[in-house]
Amino acid sequence: YAKPPKHLDTLLSLLSENFMAHGGFLSGGAAYNQWNVYAAPFAKGLTYSECKQCVQAFIFDANQSLVSKGGQLVFSSLNIEFSVPEFMKDLDAWGPGGVINGKYSDYINEAEMLTEALLEVIEEGDGHGKAHTFPNFIFALRREFIDHPLMKKLHQVIAKCPTPYLANM
């Protein structure tokens, strides 16, 4: 039994292990919805560099885990928001140690920092500069974020690395 994680790197490691367990025992893909919003409380107090390092390790790990049937990568997806969507702002924010610590609206900066770090990791690619195979990156396009600064960054990333998916919400 693992206690609830207290740090972002531990949370992302557990999510990666969950992907691997899913891929080894079940068929079909696995996804985490609003990934950056739910992870945001764990990024509180981190610098951008620390946050990006955690995200990069998570994505690299997802591309090294040949544990699915036939020694394949786990078919996995991350659903990403540009910020905390309106419908989540008043929800209790579960954070380090499994403790409710405010509302998700208290973690807008952290959710956006995770999105920005992820976009940078996607743009940089792997150690050879090639696109990451998994997880699939699915960005939620919501009217409330159409003019968000990270929307422009997403388009720059897609121009270089056309692997992210866009979901019109």
Role assignments for model-derived ranges:
Residues 1-169:
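Conserved catalytic cores of very large enzyme subunits
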